[in-house]
Design a protein with these regions (language model features):
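Phosphate/pyrophosphate-binding loop motifs in nucleotide- or prenyl diphosphate-using proteins
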Residues: 22
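Single conserved hydrophobic/aromatic residue that forms the stacking wall/gate
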Residues: 1-5, 9
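Terminal recognition/anchoring or ligand-binding modules at protein termini
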Residues: 26-42, 49-225
Length: 226
């Protein structure tokens, strides 16, 4: 695979691969400029294309690429919680933030009449590439206590958390609408520790889903709204 850039000798293979997919475009003057920093807009453009957005159709190239990129990325939530100007070079922390947000947007399957069409199953980079899904529910028991039992002896084993009204979202996007989830009929006990102050709270978990939901690897859990 060959790119249009003449200065990618150090890491030529994967830079050229990204060129071939349209994820990167260099400076537009035949140079990739590998030693330069990356701005928020530049990173967002790469992440958008990785999620399936067409750079040409979305206007992410040409003189107005930065404006169009910032607009689309903001709409999709890629810049959520970013306090720095999107045209500034990214810190490592802010780069991680943008990547985290981009993992949570729906992937694009195709374009029809110039409009981006997402997959019917609302897949995201997070679910497609890593098998990670969003789960919501109310914590009703953990190693500290169970809500229906006040005796501490009735608490669950260490490293266990019981959730009721569990919803498994088909998409991990923060903008998922009602109807895009499957609700479990019975409480589910997950293999994860949670603090006592989560009891009675509605929480979100990110899990690497297995056939049996209770056996899924829990990657993170937080109280909704935090």
């Amino acid at each position: 695979i060959s790119s249009a850039a003449s200065d990618v000798y150090k890491r030529q293979s994967y830079i050229n691969y990204c060129y071939s997919l349209g994820i990167i475009a260099g400076r537009g003057n035949g140079k990739f400029d590998p030693a330069a920093t990356v701005t928020g807009n530049e990173a967002a453009k790469m992440l958008l294309v990785a999620a399936g957005y067409d750079a040409q159709l979305e206007g992410l190239t040409g003189n107005d690429w930065a404006i169009k990129t910032a607009s689309l990325a903001s709409t999709l939530g890629i810049f959520d919680d970013l306090t720095a100007p999107t045209g500034d070079p990214l810190t490592r922390d802010n780069a991680a933030l943008l990547i985290y947000n981009a993992l949570d947007i729906e992937m694009i399957q195709k374009y029809e009449n110039g409009y981006a069409i997402a997959f019917e199953d609302h897949r995201t980079l997070l679910s497609t590439k890593y098998g990670v899904y969003k789960v919501e529910g109310v914590v009703t028991g953990n190693e500290w206590a169970q809500l229906e039992d006040t005796d501490s002896e009735d608490s669950l084993a260490t490293g266990k958390t019981k959730m009721d009204h569990v919803k498994v979202y088909k998409s991990t996007t923060s903008n998922t609408v009602v109807g895009e989830y499957e609700e479990e009929k019975n409480p589910v006990i997950f293999n994860v520790s949670t603090p006592v102050d989560m009891l009675g709270q509605t929480v979100t978990m990110y899990v690497r889903k297995t056939t049996v939901l209770a056996n899924s690897e829990v990657l993170g859990v937080y109280v909704n709204g935090n």
